[in-house]
UniProtKB/Swiss-Prot annotation:
PROSITE patterns: KINESIN_MOTOR_1, KINESIN_MOTOR_2. There is a cross-link at residue 460 (Glycyl lysine isopeptide (Lys-Gly) (interchain with G-Cter in SUMO2)). It comes from Bos taurus (Bovine). ATP binds at residues 122-129. Its main location: nucleus. Belongs to the TRAFAC class myosin-kinesin ATPase superfamily. Kinesin family. GO terms for biological process: DNA repair; metaphase chromosome alignment; microtubule-based movement; mitotic metaphase chromosome alignment; sister chromatid cohesion. Keywords: ATP-binding, Coiled coil, Cytoplasm, Cytoskeleton, DNA-binding, Isopeptide bond, Microtubule, Motor protein, Nucleotide-binding, Nucleus, Phosphoprotein, Ubl conjugation. Residues 460-498 form a coiled coil. This is Kinesin-like protein KIF22. The gene is KIF22.
Length: 662
């Protein structure tokens, strides 16, 4: 089979395989993708706590069978509300029953490169921490799951098995919307990120490798003491934070094609919702309770959004829901253990927990296998300068000295047939599936070769293209040199014909641009466009007076310019207004201020509803205005506003009267 393939085809096929890097195969094979999985919900009813049950106290919740329960209807005491879940564990159920019935079956998914999560939900004092941690006599879900998972990894990763497995653990808490590393408490608040493939990760989170249950206990027990707990009126050891234990299982295939898998297990102990009227929380405890209730409220919003199919799911509204993005509506096999209490004083909390559990079981997750393929990458072949440029270009780059001292090249012996077939001989050890892929690739290359498709990736063809490019550049340089010589000849001819032109040309054109002196004309004055007539200044008669409107500082005033002093006058355009029209405009504005109504006053520029009312009120109290400048005496109109009013209205009126040059 190896000898039947052309040598060039085998080299290209080997390069295509060996040159491939790490490719994502998270959706490898439609048949291997698991079907959508619904969030499984189990309800655990804890027994009465010692000292809390009275003689006539009966539980408000009663189990019907292994999957259903009923609770009294608070609206109608003669009716009961029935709930059905995937599993129901009564007060006589043990830790082993809960673990074996609901948690243990999902551990196998981790060895398939899939994610799984277990959440303990319920009100404060319902037994969530006991379900997850337990006691030395009755271990909970976390120690049992780690013990079985480590045993599975030892069996699957033993010598002679196709996969090598490794397990790491991380432990964190979400306290008042801060992500804290319990393995390294000094790390501070950590951030939650999302990579390009949609995976949730926490940069800087400590990961401890574990190979046995003793390793797990050595890291987990001290970290558990770092979790924030506090005493309330309802619970002496109330968890004040959400605790998350993250266990990663990495698998590497020992033989080709060297696949890699990663499975993550989330074990989450949620803090309980609290009624501050009953817990008596104050100060710090009240702040902690607010953060807990807020995150649990957002968790309920996420569940409702997933069930209703809303376009936006509010994962980012809380650190807890952001971290649980894989568990609810994501790619994990999820188990929700709702813990409830039998006491009647917890009735409303129990109903709320059951309603949340009933909504959660409608959430659909879509698990997939986190698998990637790692192929060996060959080192790039280093080519010499002579092989890249060719013989002629290499001689030009070396120079005459190196060319004389160069030793003659020895003839290279042709490669043997076994050396030519060496890239393909490595394929004989591969599995049949990989060999089938290689054969299909060979057939594809053969079909392209039969159609005359050029193979431009060979070193000889690349060298020829490079040499052709260099030759084209050389021709372009020669053309530019010839053009430069022609231009220089023209310049010399012009210099010989006209010495004066030569001097001007040499000082302006042949001088470098960076050294040219640029003469800047005197800047023109900035003219403000006003509704006045623009005239060009004419030669005035002696001793004539011209009134010109000029700007000096922040105020405008009329100045007299003696036209008999021509050296002080500047050529240009000036703004002029007739004194008669100015007086007429002032009188018209004064009449309008004294006789006009508020509506008439609003027709003036810079006068609005408020200022018009102020003017009318001042006129009624103090009588008519004697001059336009009295407008400044009105309360609420400053001197600057009065000047702006005069400029806007008097000049506009003058323009309307058709003022001309004086």
């Amino acid at each position: 089979m190896d000898a039947g393939l052309p040598a060039r085809r085998r080299r290209e096929m080997a390069a295509a395989i060996s040159g491939a890097g790490r490719c994502r195969l998270s959706k490898v094979g439609a048949g291997r993708r698991p079907p959508p999985a619904r969030v499984r919900v189990a309800v655990r009813l804890r027994p009465f706590v010692d000292g809390t049950a009275g003689e006539n106290d009966t539980p408000c919740v009663r189990g019907l069978d292994s999957c259903s329960l009923e609770i009294a209807n608070w609206r109608n005491h003669q009716e009961t509300l029935k709930y059905q879940f995937d599993a129901f564990y009564g007060e006589r159920s043990s830790q082993q029953d809960i673990y074996a019935g609901s948690v243990q079956p999902i551990l196998r998914h981790l060895l398939e490169g899939q994610n799984a999560s277990v959440l303990a939900y319920g009100p404060t004092g319902a037994g969530k921490t006991h379900t997850m941690l337990g006691s030395p006599e009755q271990p909970g879900v976390i120690p049992r799951a780690l013990m079985d998972l480590l045993q599975l990894t030892r069996e699957e990763g033993a010598e002679g098995r196709p996969w090598a497995l490794s397990v790491t653990m991380s432990y964190l808490e979400i306290y008042q919307e801060k992500v804290l590393d319990l393995l390294e408490p000094s790390s501070g608040d950590l951030v939650i990120r999302e990579d390009c493939r949609g995976n949730i990760l926490i940069p800087g989170l400590t990961q401890k490798p574990i190979t046995s249950f003793a390793d797990f206990e050595r890291h987990f027990l001290p970290a558990s003491r770092n979790r924030t707990v506090g005493a309330t009126r309802l619970n002496q050891r109330s968890s004040r934070s959400h605790a998350v234990l993250l266990v990663k299982v990495d698998q590497r295939e020992r033989l080709a094609p060297f696949r890699q898998r990663e499975g993550k297990l989330y074990l989450i102990d949620l803090a309980g919702s609290e009624d501050n009227r009953r817990t008596g929380n104050k100060g710090l405890r009240l702040k902690e309770s607010g953060a807990i209730n807020t995150s649990l409220f957002v968790l309920g919003k996420v569940v409702d959004a997933l069930n209703q199919g809303l376009p936006r799911v509010p994962y980012r509204d809380s650190k807890l829901t952001r971290l649980l993005q894989d568990s609810l509506g994501g790619s994990a096999h999820s188990i929700l253990i709702a813990n409830i209490a039998p006491e009647r004083r917890f009735y409303l909390d129990t109903v709320s927990a059951l309603n949340f559990a009933a909504r959660s079981k409608e959430v659909i997750n879509r698990p997939f296998t986190n698998e990637s393929l790692q192929l060996p990458v060959l080192a790039p072949v280093k080519l010499s300068q002579k092989e890249l440029l060719g013989p002629s270009e290499a001689k030009r780059a070396r120079g005459p000295e190196e060319e004389e001292t160069e030793s003659p090249e020895l003839p290279i012996a042709p490669a043997s047939a076994s050396q030519k077939l060496s890239p393909l001989q490595k394929l004989s050890s591969m599995d049949p599936a990989m060999l089938e892929r290689l054969l299909s690739l060979d057939r594809l290359l053969g079909s392209q070769g039969s159609q005359g498709t050029p193979l431009l990736s060979t070193p000889k063809r690349e060298r020829m293209v490079l040499m052709k490019t260099v030759e084209e550049k050389d021709l372009e340089i020669e053309r530019l040199k010839m053009k430069q010589k022609e231009l220089e000849a023209k310049v010399l001819a012009q210099e010989a014909a006209d010495p004066k032109e030569k001097e001007n040309y040499s000082t302006t054109m042949l001088r470098p641009l960076a050294r040219r002196t640029v003469t800047v004309a005197k800047p023109l004055k900035k003219a403000v466009v006003m509704p006045l007539q623009l005239i060009q200044e004419q030669a005035a008669s002696p001793n004539a007076k011209i009134h010109i409107l000029k700007k000096k500082g922040r105020k405008r005033k009329l100045e007299s310019l003696d036209a008999s002093q021509p050296e002080k006058a500047e050529d240009g355009w000036e703004l002029q207004i007739s004194p008669e029209l100015l007086a007429h405009g002032r009188q018209k504005i004064l009449d309008l201020l004294n006789e006009g109504s508020a509506r008439d006053l609003r027709s003036l520029q810079r006068i609005g509803q408020k200022k018009a009312q102020l003017i009318v009120g001042w006129r009624e109290l103090h009588g008519p205005f004697s001059q336009v400048e009295d407008l400044e005496r009105v309360e609420g109109i400053s001197g600057k506003q009065m000047e702006s009013f005069l400029k806007a209205n008097i000049l506009g009126l003058a323009a309307g009267q058709g003022c001309g040059p004086s």
